[in-house]
């Protein structure tokens, strides 16, 4: 076949085909049929363009041997056969001068007379099958498709064949000749059978052997073979048909498919009630750190040593008092618990050698705060079979809560940059395989955008707290162990820094099952006055424990330092996921990668560098009542990361349900925006399923509010 190609086609065409195959890493000695197909396609493109000009009056004319001085312009711009970069440059130039819409795939020609790009197809199969494959791949109304076959058939968009009869006949004759030449050399059958369809996502895999038998056996009734069934599915027209089928299924099913129009959807109903309260396992934007720079003390890296060193940096401690009581708790017990921590830390400092861990004395205040002996006694079921009124105890319905502004503020803060770096370059992890250049480049760009982000601080804080708590829960099951809440970072100057946010005291932790709960008391430093948003701190008892001197524009200012204390609980499975919060970095990196991939496939080259370095370009960051908010690519990275981190921090059944159900409505709205004319039945039921998840969770309520903003702007 290779010899035939070199004899049959013009050397320039052969050279271009060789170059194209080389570019795609294909060996023309092996892929000889492909070599022939590329040459044929190139020749048809050149013949399509040959002798066609536009005269001074703008009319299309065919000139085979005309006056060389005539002012004629080539009617067709040939794009096929050019180097990819040059081809895209030509296309950009055409689009800029003519206003034509830029195609997503490289077309073959541009017609200056009819102002449209043309995709030429040469097929050894049925023209209409190949035409549909091309149309399906291109998915553009603007690119004109013209298909030729080796049997003299042709097919073009809207039966508009662009060229005159004679020019097309010349192409068909040439194709017929190539076929005859191949047949006479015994090459045609192999060439004809080697054609594969346009490689789109819907590529068909050949199913053979056992799998084929299983496929044929598992078809719905009335289908004799897999091909038969595939043909039916491909030609299936859904509208109207589903309703009929549903009504046959059951007398009770009465599904009318209603068209989903811009006026159809209503906003989600958010619950009324008192404002929602903070429910994260540790403070977020309100946290305060006591820090040491360049730690080099004895025992550096041992949490208790680090904590004591951080505590020593603060000199403003004072007699603590309750400034915001917990409505349902015994507040003096929280106060006594903090005093006990201070006293026991002081005791440690007085010892000759500081221990690696500290178990608190089991005082009455800690027993109360950690729910010691509060669990109902378990009785074997066999021992109480005969009890007449045996029943599960009643649990109250959760109280409905309304959306409060603090959760949006928390989210905004999580997207912001801090002045410290919270992850090293390798936190996201190397690939198992030798990492490709592009992948590592993307990872490094992404890391640079998010390493200083507050959401990244939350990740490292969450990983540390959950790891320490799970370790202590397994290693000291009966002890009330004191666990410092620590994180590590680097300053702008690259100096190491150790931070103390507060302490946790864990309760008894005989955790047999994944869902068994360990109680803990958290005590966290803050400069936030709880009286400003008391509803946010409903679950906390807040003490004033000191005064902190802060540098400001007018000199040093003294601010009260608060301690946020609460009883909380977690389980093995929750701690396991908390330890894996670094996954949030990976999830948001993958979302950014898919954006880069989409951009790269349009431009047909890797756009990673441009994506991160083009500072002038803005991207949609999110929805607000004002409309779609836009920001830099760094802002997009940090927003996606913050969403992923909040999904982890505020994980709950309400979030699971809301995400799953609202996604269905989102897809319907997207279909409407894409002019796919969606239809729905039981839309009311879908709204019900979404709204039953809107109870009291702050993060879910915020997402529902964002969803409403999206609905408003998407359906304008």
UniProtKB/Swiss-Prot annotation:
This is Polymerase acidic protein. The keyword Phosphoprotein applies. Phosphorylated on serines and threonines by host kinases, including human casein kinase II. Gene3D superfamilies: Influenza RNA-dependent RNA polymerase subunit PA, endonuclease domain. It comes from Influenza A virus (strain A/Wilson-Smith/1933 H1N1) (Influenza A virus (strain A/WS/1933 H1N1)). Belongs to the influenza viruses PA family. It is an enzyme of class 3 (hydrolase). GO terms for biological process: cap snatching; DNA-templated transcription; negative regulation of viral genome replication; negative regulation of viral transcription; negative stranded viral RNA replication; protein import into nucleus; symbiont-mediated suppression of host gene expression; symbiont-mediated suppression of host mRNA transcription via inhibition of RNA polymerase II activity. Its main location: host cell. One of its GO terms (cellular component) is host cell nucleus. Plays an essential role in viral RNA transcription and replication by forming the heterotrimeric polymerase complex together with PB1 and PB2 subunits. The complex transcribes viral mRNAs by using a unique mechanism called cap-snatching. It consists in the hijacking and cleavage of host capped pre-mRNAs. These short capped RNAs are then used as primers for viral mRNAs. The PB2 subunit is responsible for the binding of the 5' cap of cellular pre-mRNAs which are subsequently cleaved after 10-13 nucleotides by the PA subunit that carries the endonuclease activity. A motif (Nuclear localization signal 1 (NLS1)) lies at residues 124-139. Changing residue 226 to P: Confers temperature sensitivity. Influenza RNA polymerase is composed of three subunits: PB1, PB2 and PA. Interacts (via C-terminus) with PB1 (via N-terminus). It is found in: Host cytoplasm; Host nucleus. The gene is PA. Its EC number is 3.1.-.-. Its cofactor is Mn(2+). The keyword Repeat does not apply.
